[in-house]
């Protein structure tokens, strides 16, 4: 019984795959695993805190927008009502009130612009998703056997660079976000 070249090639490929897996497994050590796992766990916590911060800024933006809409509606209604008032003093009082409400509306809009709440909400939400994606990928890789993971040097380099990139791109967190994280996960 002779073995064809194709069969020899297939057997060689299977043996090479086994050798590659063995070499890959030997490239891993506990220090690499611990460092990568720790970065993944930190990324998970940062995802939680940035998602919470995104919700805070989105809520603030929505409140300021609603207050502005309500105040503008009141000022507009007062201006319309003032047109139908015959008494000059009453008309002036209504117009001054409408002007005051208009000033209040301008103040609310200035606050919204100053805090830039919409942009902060979007940036915190985006970085939260990126930290979540990082955590999922690290969890998947570290959940595999040493033979089936990406090579240790490749995964370590990627994990370090991506974690540092995310840290650099992330907006600062509020103290309330950090406190909520500590309170929520105090038993861990």
Language-model regions: role of each:
Residues 71-90:
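Juxtamembrane "helix exit" motif at the C-terminal ends of alpha-helical transmembrane segments
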Residues 2-70, 81, 94, 108-188:
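Conserved non-transmembrane functional hotspots
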Residues 88-101:
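Hydrophobic alpha-helical transmembrane segments
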Residues 78, 85, 102, 159-160:
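Short alpha-helix boundary/capping motifs
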Residues 73-76, 100-111:
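Single-pass alpha-helical transmembrane signal-anchor segments
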